Swiss-Prot record:
Catalytic activity: N-acetyl-L-glutamate 5-semialdehyde + phosphate + NADP(+) = N-acetyl-L-glutamyl 5-phosphate + NADPH + H(+)
The EC number(s) this enzyme carries: 1.2.1.38
Protein's name in the database: N-acetyl-gamma-glutamyl-phosphate reductase
Pfam families xref list: Semialdhyde_dh, Semialdhyde_dhC_1
Disulphide connectivity of cysteines: none
Pathway participation: Amino-acid biosynthesis; L-arginine biosynthesis; N(2)-acetyl-L-ornithine from L-glutamate: step 3/4
Subcellular location: Cytoplasm
Top-level class of the enzyme under EC nomenclature: oxidoreductase
Species this protein is from: Clostridium botulinum (strain Alaska E43 / Type E3)
Role: Catalyzes the NADPH-dependent reduction of N-acetyl-5-glutamyl phosphate to yield N-acetyl-L-glutamate 5-semialdehyde.
Record-level GO BP terms: L-arginine biosynthetic process
Active site: C148
SMART domains according to UniProt: Semialdhyde_dh
Top-level division of the source organism's lineage: Bacteria
Length: 344
């Protein structure tokens, strides 16, 4: 049985990983760590695990020693050194943070305020969007799990950019997320009286997911792609919905666009292109690893509009990480992820 561990197990992403991994039939959780709750039983921190596990938060070195696959669920800047130890011990590292998502060191320094600590390691990391990089992921031992907003936006745009059908500049990405995307640490913006009955844009023009999205989209289009990205906080726990506006290079009808999307995603089980006339929504992807995409045209402005919806904690984080692990280990891609959203 493959042993799996988590470093940073008690944040929202880490604990969501645990919840999903406990239902995975091909792995066993060997050890977990948490700086904030070192030495404490998991079910004393999160009561939803009572009777399901006797895991105790231990130290990072024990997690590396005891497991074959290690997920690192840490704030930016903390994963590089740890990932180096994991790779040196011939283990698989799936990093949930931002440390390996950007390939350009200058860009990384601009957005995150530091240089790469281990430049050679960055060269061997693979961006873990399975619908784009499945074969590369299969051969890798270091995965940069994509961000939640980038996942929703990139899945929404890949087919158009691969087919060179839209202009690479002037793309507008208007995204809304549940508050779990801000993490478990206390914040005024996510304080209940501030967020309840409210709807707030934040980090306008300066969100750190911007360079990640632009780099991946530019690689797909083989030309520089620029976006205007504005995230918003919804007064809900989980889910992301992105409304993406782009301009076609030549006039194209909606049926042709729909066929391009259905052809591209036909063998990618976690992405569902909705029938024309339907509109993607958070409700129908919540608590699943699915992405729903709906396609629309603004005939008055000759503009393509894509709606892309995911669960930010699953397809946007923990579920996608498990999907990557399944690919690397040769399991069925949906192992542990055969999740259906509740109807209400």
């Amino acid at each position: 049985m493959i042993k799996v561990g988590i470093i940073g197990a008690t944040g929202y992403v880490g604990v969501e990983l645990l919840r999903l991994l406990l239902n995975h039939s091909q792995i066993e959780i060997g050890a977990i760590s948490s700086v904030s709750f070192d030495g404490q039983e998991l079910d004393s921190i999160y009561k939803n695990f009572l009777g399901r596990t006797n895991l105790i938060c231990t130290n990072m070195n024990e997690v590396i020693e005891k497991n074959d696959v290690i997920f690192t669920a840490l704030p930016p800047g903390l994963s590089e050194d740890i990932a180096t130890k994991i790779i040196e011990n011939n283990k698989i590292c799936i990093d949930m943070g931002a440390d390996f998502r950007l390939s350009n060191e200058e860009e990384y320094k601009y957005w995150y305020g530091k240089n790469f600590s281990h430049p050679k390691l960055h060269k061997q990391s693979i961006y873990g969007l399975p619908e784009l990089n499945k074969e590369k992921i299969r051969k890798s031992s270091l995965i940069a799990n994509p961000g939640c907003y980038p996942t929703s936006i990139e899945l929404g745009l890949i087919p158009l950019l691969k087919n060179l059908l839209i202009k690479p500049n002037g793309i507008i990405c208007d995204s809304k997320s549940g508050t779990t995307g801000s993490g478990r640490s206390l914040s005024l913006n996510t304080h209940f009286p501030e967020e309840n009955e409210n709807f707030t844009p934040y980090k306008i023009g300066e969100h750190r997911h911007t360079p990640e999205i632009e780099e991946i989209l530019s690689n797909i289009a083989n030309t520089k792609v620029t976006i205007t990205f504005t995230p918003h906080l919804l007064p809900i726990n989980r889910g992301i919905i992105s409304t993406i506006y782009c301009t076609p290079k030549e006039k194209i009808d909606l049926n042709s666009i729909h066929k391009i999307y259905t052809d591209f995603y036909k063998d990618k089980e976690f992405v569902n292109v909705l029938p024309l006339g339907d509109i993607a929504s958070i409700k129908n992807v919540k608590l699943s690893n699915n992405c729903h995409i709906s396609l629309h045209l603004n005939h008055r402005k000759d503009q393509i509009i894509i709606i892309s919806a995911i669960d930010n904690m699953i397809k946007g984080a923990a579920g996608q990480a498990i999907q990557n692990m399944n690919i690397i280990l040769g399991f069925k891609e949906n192992e542990g992820l055969n999740l259906i959203s509740p109807a209400f």
